[in-house]
Amino acid sequence: FQFAAFCGSFRAHGRTWWTRLPWGWGGSDMGPREFNNTNAAIPAGDRRNILETEMNNPAIEPVVRKYDELRYQLMPYTYTSAREARDSGLPLMRALWVHYPEDPQARALGDEFLWGRDLLIAPVYAKGATSRDVYLPKGEWYDWWTRERSSGGKRVRRVVDLSTMPIYVRAGSIIPLDAVRQYTSQPVADPTTLQIFRGADGQYTLYDDDGISQAYLTGKGTWIRMTWTDKSRQLTIEPGAPTGATNVVG
């Protein structure tokens, strides 16, 4: 599920057919329990106990909620990246070599990727892992969860658990964050917040439209250009400043 939150198609359900809850992956060592009509031999009482267990998983549910909410908070960033994909052909999920073609290590990697331009995602794919090595390309990078700053051009070892998939942000990035919502069109009162990660100058162009119609095909959308000057800690926004807060990291 952690990895799914950074895929173009957000697969937000488990495999247990009964409930399809995101954490419905069963608890046996054999993997997910696939209940179907051939399970008629399971007594009805046991089936009820299984159902209740799947619906109440205090160890997993908070993790699912955390990444689900992050997916929605990053919607302005992801939506802008989707528009970029439509206009340029650049995918949402990008191999590191797309933006670091001269880096031989970036060209060789297949187990981490960029989400849009500025977020580096390193899924944990080894069962029971408590850490994983993450390669950071040239430049300065911030750990999304701790805000710890690291220099790139090398590997760093990141402690991991179920709730902490390694995510890094490129220095100079301007990341728009929305309020948590239950679905994409749900109105929210809180404004969009801009998270700025210091250490380099940066530029970002935020895109938005009505999110419903095909009007974007005829140019009905809004582009807001932003420029961050790191030395003077100055953010310039044009043509129309969005209503919201700005947080500077670093």
Spans of features found by a protein language model:
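Catalytic-domain carbohydrate-binding cleft regions of carbohydrate-active enzymes
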Residues: 1-170
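Accessory, solvent-exposed terminal regions and/or long lumenal/extracellular loops of proteins
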Residues: 164-250
